[in-house]
Amino acid sequence: MFQTFISRHNSNFFSDKLVASSVTPASLAPVLQTPKATSSTLYFDSLTVNAGNGGFLHCIQMDTSVNAANQVVSVGADIAFDADPKFFACLVRFESSSVPTTLPTAYDVYPLNGRHDGGYYTVKDCVTIDVLPRTPGNNVYVGFMVWSNFTATKCRGLVSLNQVIKVIICLQPLK
């Protein structure tokens, strides 16, 4: 099934500014921020990315009270690095019984259709995610993750995640 990017985000008009000033990529990727919301926009102006092989991510907690096992998550991101790292960006789905600070060892990866141009990366995409926990009592989280063999660099940009809960029906005029 082909999905197009859902451009109407229900996120706040203002974005959250990242509090952390630096991050060290790791195999258990550190979580930059996890709001208890189904929609979040994170802005980071001058994030120092320390040298390391691994990643970091921004995630949201999924609303599991909806009457569907699968929900669409849309992502819009525009990030830039001062250096020109070759990196992989994706959505990840994982479960945790508490607010995560790092990516757990068990997670699902969803590739994104983004554009990498030099030190810039832009993506507008959406993915259908299983929102029901596989382990009773866990919460489901979805995050935008950047993974690379980083050299020390600065990073700036905006990442917007949105769980699409509303169904929008578009009627076309009769011909």
Curated annotation (Swiss-Prot):
GO terms for biological process: symbiont entry into host cell; symbiont-mediated perturbation of host process; virion attachment to host cell. The virion is composed of 60 copies each of the F, G, and J proteins, and 12 copies of the H protein. There are 12 spikes which are each composed of 5 G and one H proteins. Its main location: virion. Keywords: Capsid protein, Host-virus interaction, Viral attachment to host cell, Viral genome ejection through host cell envelope, Viral penetration into host cytoplasm, Virion, Virus entry into host cell. SUPFAM superfamilies: ssDNA viruses. It holds the Pfam family Phage_G. InterPro entries: Capsid/spike_ssDNA_virus, Spike_G, Viral_coat. One of its GO terms (cellular component) is viral capsid. Attaches the circulating virion to the bacterial lipopolysaccharides which serve as receptor for the virus. Determines the phage host-range. Probably triggers with protein H the injection of the phage DNA into the host cytoplasm upon conformational changes induced by the interaction with host lipopolysaccharides. It is found in: Virion. Belongs to the microvirus G protein family. This is Major spike protein G.
